[in-house]
Amino acid sequence: MAQTLIAAYKTIDVKHFAHSYHSYFLRPGNMDKSITFTVDRIRDGKSFTTRSVKAIQEGEAIFNCSISFQKREKGLEHQIEMPDVPEPESLKSEQEIREEILAELKMNKEDMPMFIKQREIEMRPVEHQNYFKPERMPPYKNTWIKTDGSIPKDQVIQQAFLLYISDMGLLGAANNSVGVNFLTKNLQNASLDHAMWFHRKLDLDGWFLYSIDSPVTRNARGFSRGSIFSRDGKLIASCTQEGLIRLWEN
């Protein structure tokens, strides 16, 4: 997703910024094969500009998206309140939680699945979960996230990074609501679509809160929505995702 956003920005006037992103995951991609990104100029307007981007691998579209860009302008304002959650300094990091789980299960770090090994960013979940013992949980999750400060101030890069981050764990709230996760036997779990809206100019140097909830899981699909807040409570972005949650019989 981040790469398609950057590709679209290469065709956009510098006065415009991405405010709306809608995408579909069409086919599985192969990390060992190259991907070609094609950008279609759908509309160039004074206030709004639209681009369609397609990711093609071995002659087939594996992903496509539509992105709307807007010139910044003043207008009426309102936003929802940030959830009342503990400050990040009072919480354990994902790494600390992982090490506790490893010690409890007497596992080596090398035995941990790739998806739950240490990330390059720091994440401190408000609600803890044991990946190896999934159980039904309330359909929401809150996580404080912080980068190492190395992300450029360039808004294109900051938006692309936040779009990338937004895909981490978004479907997890829907999985939690039915007591499964990516380690569950016979579970087929995959993103089907992803949408994101950028509300403000970004500054991702410090902590920000990713608050996710899942209104419904049904018909082998889970639906989740996320709100991303700066530490001082400003809503900087929103996102939604529907994903496949298909549990095959033995």
Language-model-detected regions and their locations in the chain:
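Terminal targeting signals and extreme-terminal segments of soluble enzymes
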Residues: M1-N250
